[in-house]
Amino acid sequence: MDLVLTLIAAPNSNALGDDIVARAKTVLAAAGARVGDVLWLAAGEACDIGFAGLSLDIADTALRDAGLGVDAVTQTAKTRRKKLLIADMDSTMVTGETLDELAAFAGVKDHVAAITARAMNGELDFEAALDERVGLLDGMSTDMLAEAWKEIEYTGGAKTLVATMKANGAFAALVSGGFDYFTGAVRRELGFDFDQANVLITQDGKLTGKVQKPVLDRQAKVDALEKLTAEQGIGVEDAIAVGDGANDLQMISLAGTGVAFHAKPAVQEQARICINHGDLTALLYLQGYAKSDFVI
């Protein structure tokens, strides 16, 4: 079977039962596919179903219409294992938005968070929204960066994703429209090989309310993907990209496997692969790793 459907439920939920698997097989067969055997990647959590004779677009539509209640991702089986991970940081590798947490120390978190939400949904120009939010932090002590970092939590599966891919020879890159203070911390703690982000301009131990130009925007993420794959001697088809915001869309679209992870509505409308139930270990299941293969 040259194609594979991967079904993924929330971790440790035991929500993926034989009934859902049987329904998925029936949906594929009814759409005209030849359906193969089931390979369990994690009991009650993730499995592969091989199939052939059906386009991915038709399979995706049929599975989406079926409303299985789990993540259902189709792809070509032969090329699923990737050699490079390129990941967004905010609301992807970490659960929140680092700029919003920083804004809390200036008493403007709600205002900044509202702008962030609109920008990440593609409703506002990214650079203009970034400048406006950073401008509200003018005069803040740089000591607050460390305080904001204390409020940040890693997304479930983040460390396992990076460690497992690296143990299997992949290169791991963190590329964010956030700030290098935070991406540096994430790189060190999770084991990323590389990080790139925006730079807050400081003077005399205080934020100036400005960010170094040019900003790292959606095009910069695409440029990073192309540069990193070239440096590794591989193609963009050998990369798996993950993000949640509008500024991740081009990167997600270009990578061999592009994942919208618990993403904003506008992003989910355009991305082919969406993960809404699983945590970041879903990206390992998508590549054919079984839970027993995970490096914790």
Where do the protein language model's features map onto the residues?
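Non-catalytic pre-domain segments flanking phosphatase-related domains
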Residues: M1-A87, V295-I296
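Conserved strand-to-helix beginnings and helix N-cap segments that scaffold or border functional pockets
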Residues: D18-V21, L99, K159, K264
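Exposed alpha-helical structural elements
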Residues: R23, I58-A62, H111-A114, D125, ...
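A generic alpha-helix structural signal
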Residues: K25, D60-L63, T116, W149, ...
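Alpha-helical substrate-recognition element adjacent to the catalytic core
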Residues: G32-G50, T74-R80, T92-L200, D204-G205, ...
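Residue-level marker of motif borders
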Residues: K83-L85, A117, A239
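Asp-based phosphoryl-transfer active-site loop
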Residues: K83-T98, N247, I252
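C-terminal cap/substrate-recognition subdomain and adjoining C-terminal extension
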Residues: G139-M140, A146-T257, F261-I296
